[in-house]
């Protein structure tokens, strides 16, 4: 395999997917390079979330390829993709309301060694993650819950 720097960070080729018999994604192809700022725009129901969920292994693709840094992850389950250090912050809140902020953050990690140091770095952007680490996540405001989700993605 060639060095990772020779590959786009994300490469999608001919991706097809949807829900049941309803096709949503039709031959989607794109490359996103490391450091590039990229946005997916469109009206409601156009497939933005379906695309992200399919790329992340949360929905099965009907056909096509997805690669992260040259590694073909087509057909991989989401937990295996996250082990590559790839994260996704969903538009719907996916926190565990009854767990603490810290417990929600730890869920993203397969290896919790160095958690305190990593949390310190993320808390530079989102201090609430440290100051309220024992608080039940369900008691956070909507904006604070979004910070928790972004922090969890950054920790992976």
Regions found by a protein language model. Give the residues of each.
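Short beta-strand immediately N-terminal to the Walker A/P-loop
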Residues: 38-39, 88
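Conserved ABC transporter NBD signature motif
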Residues: 64-72, 84, 117-118, 124
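Helix-to-loop junction immediately C-terminal to a conserved catalytic motif
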Residues: 56
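ABC ATPase C-loop
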Residues: 153-154
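ABC-type ATPase nucleotide-binding domains, specifically the catalytic core motifs of the NBD
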Residues: 20, 60, 76, 101-119, ...
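Conserved ABC ATPase signature
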Residues: 136-140, 144
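The feature captures the beta-strand-to-loop junction immediately N-terminal to the Walker
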Residues: 41-43
